[in-house]
Amino acid sequence: MKRSLPLLLFAFCATSAWCQTIRIVNNNPGATGGVNVYTGATALQNAINASVSGDILHVIPGTVSNGNVTITDKSLTILGVGLDPQKGLGTRSLVGDINLVGPASSGFRASGIHFLRLLPNISCSSTWTISNILIENCQFNAVQMLSSACAIGNMIVRNCVINSHQGFSSGPQAFEIFVNSGVLITNNIIRCQSNNAGVVKGDGLTITNNLFYGGGTFGVFTDTDNSIVRNNIFSRTSPALNTTTCTGNTFQNNIVFGSSDNSFTDGIAGNTSTGHIIADPLLTNVPSTTSDWVYTYDITLLAGSPAINAGLDGTNMGPTGGILPFDEEGTLLPLIEAINMPAIVTKGVDLEVNIKAKGN
């Protein structure tokens, strides 16, 4: 069903201060361009180039990726149709690598898109920090820093499906984060599929209420230091640490099952583990696999699961616990089809904007 959604934006641009622009990105064949509507193979990059900090880029779903993009010293939001959209859309908002360059790229947010990698500080010519990054309701392969000269500050990755491809070091990894001042990885589903490199590499991370799944023989952590690992489920993948490269980590209330090494490292190299459980978490349907996540799988805990209300905070271990439990559909956004507004905007006068959108 299509609806016309009239929005009255009160005191729109009433001062000379910065104003937010919504830009529509549609690379589907035959898409029609217009004011703040970008089409063609480079639609997303063109929209980024035209944007200023604070702008929102709405990526229309399609079958062809919008390709790799670079955001240089702009604080932008990229929104897609949702993590696993319903209503028979059958397509996703697809993007390649997202490269963030420069400290003014702080405040970047991505929600509801399927992308390859987030590469913060991909071109780090001097010491800077990109901060306040939010990745939510997305599917992606990895978050990776290419340089230890720069840093990430206050990044949150939540309610995502992470398939752990395209590592730069010894194998495919989900996270390679060298220098940070606050990275929270919470309520995600994370694939483990390499026996020579864990999927998490970093220092000072907080890792809570995730599901790490695999095929029974692989481990999660490599060169992970001074991190908090709490309320996670390790299904057919090992949380055991290599104490030569992993030091000073605190594990609290995690559960492991079905791995070749169902153990938690405690009392070695400054690593500690308390409240851990070695038992089947009784997930409804998560098979033994190293393949990418399939959305027909079901992470719901069955009755009698030892992970129910067993987290340090009294909620479930794994993605169904914590403050914001995992929602496989993510936050579904309406599919914006057209935005109509006057060609001339008078300062200090209310502006009426008509948005035509299709429900999701």
Say what each PLM segment does:
Residues 1-23:
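Bacterial Sec-dependent N-terminal signal peptides
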Residues 26-65:
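Acidic Gly/Asp/Thr-rich repetitive segments characteristic of extracellular carbohydrate-active
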Residues 28-31, 61-64, 81-85, 237-238, ...:
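Acidic glycine-/aspartate-rich tracts in secreted/extracellular proteins
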Residues 315-351, 358-360:
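Short, compositionally biased P/S/T/A/G/V-rich stretches that sit at domain boundaries
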